[in-house]
Amino acid sequence: MDQDIKTVIQYPVGATEFDIPFDYLSRKFVRVSLVSDDNRRLLSNITEYRYVSKTRVKLLVDTTGFDRVEIRRFTSASERIVDFSDGSVLRAADLNVSQIQSAHIAEEARDAALMAMPQDDAGNLDARNRRIVRLAPGIDGTDAINKNQLDTTLGEAGGILSEIKGEKEQFYEYLEKFADDTTMIRGVTWVYNGGSAVGGETSIVINKPTAVFAVPYIEINGDSQEVGYQYDFNASTQTITLAKPLAAGDFLMAMTSESHLPLESLLAGTTGASSIGTKDGGTVQSALDNLGYYIVPESFGAKGDGVTDDTAAVQAAINAAKGKTLWLDASKMYICQNLVIPHAMTIAAGGRRQGGGLIPKGNSGPVVHSGDFILITAEQTVTMFNVTIDARGRPLTKVDGQRLNGLRQVDNTSGVYRSGFQLYNCNISGFSGLNIVGGAARSFGIIKDTQCESSDLTCIRIQGVDWRIDHTYVGRSGTGHGIELLNESNVVSNCDSYFNKKSGVVYTQATGKTFFKLIACTLNSNGEHGVYIACPYMQPAGIIIVDNRFWNNSTSSDGVYSNITLSYGRGHIVVGNIHEAYQPADGSSSARAAYCVNLLNGARPAHMLDNYDPAYSYRTDFCNINVVDKINYNTHHIGSAKTFTVGVSSATSQAIGVFVDGESFPRASIGNGGIRFGKGDAAPAVGLGFDNNYPNHVVSFKGLAVLGAWDTSTFRVGGYRIWAGNGAGQLYFQYGADPTSQTDGKLFVGRTVSPPASSSSSGNTGDIAIDSGFLYVCVAFNTWKRVALSTF
């Protein structure tokens, strides 16, 4: 049977032009409407739509509120296109039009019938998902009913439900009374005669091995009975007396209060805890022991076998441990995916590098394990004791965007202090991202006695302030640093940072005042610097680097990086550090820093006294500029940028003394107006200095001696050189140049002696004598000549 609708078509809204798929005799027989499930609007030709062609119309109005456009042919049965009159000429065309109009009317009538409520192929009426309106109430069982009739029926059902609720409340009241009875043990159900009464019973004896103290609740065939009205119980005879006899087959259930619970043996067993809903089983006592301050993941279904995915169980345990301690069994390893700690709590386990570990599941097929293994979102402190969080050997991706961090704390954006986490004796190692991340603006975090190794990026990154990292072992980062600090007032002490791809410790700060302490740490065998510190600008900086040990840094490029690098800032304190080599021997192949201390961008220390070995501690020099103090095994250098000053109590006090070990007096002393020298057996007395009696002169205390050797120690006065000859009484001098031999100069003459008795009397060359008659000159040793004074 042809069931197609030919004269009506509906289009979804959205377009503006629509086709007319049927033929029509006149445009007035075509109706265009906007339609929705509960509304219809007939449009007017020309003002609300118009014909684009004979078979196409265009809408001129908005379709908001409607979801379909309907085009329907509705041919008038009374308004004939062709009207026949008696005696008129009958033409075939007119007959055709008249016949077509009749056919259209019939076709539209058939479509209307199909659209009203047609029959399906089985003869059933089909409302086609539309409402049937003005339906009378049903009478017979097979009649349809209308909504009013249904509402009335449901209202009656609601009354029945209300009665059921009343019974339920009554039942709860019984239970409450039952629970409030604190004089005995409660909660045992008893069924009479196997669930089927004989019939006619009004007295029922409860036959149980233990005494029943009360029967607070009875049901007969599901109907509750009121104690004192519909039944009574006599505890001495253990008898229930009913107001109405039981019928045959009645089901009577009583709830009793007794001195002995049938469940007691079950609950006391080794699996008794499973009877009260715990997932890990065990005894009830063990479950009670775990309920107090400690939470264990086994209570939530964790296996800890190193194979099963315990994510859901461990996360449930974390959620339940707010303000408590989550205890990880020291003998187990919990495989997990990403975990979140949303509140303050403590996690404790068996010890660093022992049991009780949280292990990332890692990549599985195409699924990449990335993000943060443990993310702390709590505003308060989260503390971990003896916890191992180890990703070494797990399948992880070392590609940016797909890396897995170990433990990360979210940044603090509240504008007030939020505490950082605290780690004690933990091990967090082996992640493809960062092992440990302290959130920005988080303060007072602690990492102590912890091992943190083998991250692919930096091992520890702290973005907050006032953190303390102590007695922690950090190393073997794949591409990053050991410890990276990005804010002020942090302290790293008693730590080892080793074998990192880049630097052992890095502190950089973009703005603000810098403050950082590095105390008693060992930084060795790092690819770049031992410690690198970059202040934002020249400022009084609170950088303290004290009592640390540096060796074999700059391994990625021997002699390029430095043990200590400081950029910008003044007032840095660098004291007591030791710079050494792993192989202190000639020809050693171990890497060394370019400088022990490298000062960049004008960085200036306030105090810098380090110990180093000139032969093995560096490749280039101790420091890149000669303005710092330095100590090695046998010298002490005071930087050229400083004036060495020693204050004394008076002008006669000694300021500096140089002693030989075991001697009581100095060999040399500075003070009391000069420099004095001695033998160590008495106070120094000879030397040079200043005396007010001889202004503008250097005074020799207790004499002045000059060796006077012509080739090593001539005595100079202005441009004159004076030295001793090779004979007694010979003294030579020369002006302008050093002598080339012992006699390369003029001989001082003018020694006056007693007149000789003869020409061979004793005398030295140059001696002169005079008496009343002669002038005597010793021209050679013991050889004299004389001339009469009268000849002059």
From Swiss-Prot:
Gene Ontology MF annotations: lyase activity
- GO cellular-component term (any): virus tail
Location(s) in or outside the cell: Virion
Keywords (alphabetical) are: Degradation of host capsule during virus entry, Degradation of host cell envelope components during virus entry, Host-virus interaction, Lyase, Viral attachment to host adhesion receptor, Viral attachment to host cell, Viral tail protein, Virion, Virus entry into host cell
Pfam families in alphabetical order: Phage_T7_tail
Among the GO biological process terms of this entry, one is: symbiont entry into host cell via disruption of host cell glycocalyx
InterPro entries in the record = Pectin_lyas_fold, Pectin_lyase_fold/virulence, Phage_T7_tail_fibre-like_N
Source taxon at top rank: Viruses
Its primary localisation, in coarse terms, equals virion
Classification via SUPFAM superfamilies: Pectin lyase-like (SSF51126)
Q: What is known of its domains?
A: The N-terminus anchors the RBP to the virion. The central part and C-terminus probably binds and degrades the host exopolysaccharides.
The task this protein performs is described as:
Functions as a receptor binding protein (RBP) and probably mediates the attachment to the host capsular exopolysaccharides. Displays a depolymerase activity that specifically degrades the K30/K69-type polysaccharides of Klebsiella pneumoniae capsule, which allows the phage to reach the host cell membrane and bind the entry receptor.
Provide the family line. Answer: In the N-terminal section; belongs to the Teseptimavirus fiber family.
How is the quaternary structure described? Interacts (via N-terminus) with depolymerase 2 (via N-terminus); this interaction probably gives rise to a branched tailspike.
Identification of the protein by name: Depolymerase 1, capsule K30/K69-specific
Which source organism does the UniProt entry give? Klebsiella phage K5-2
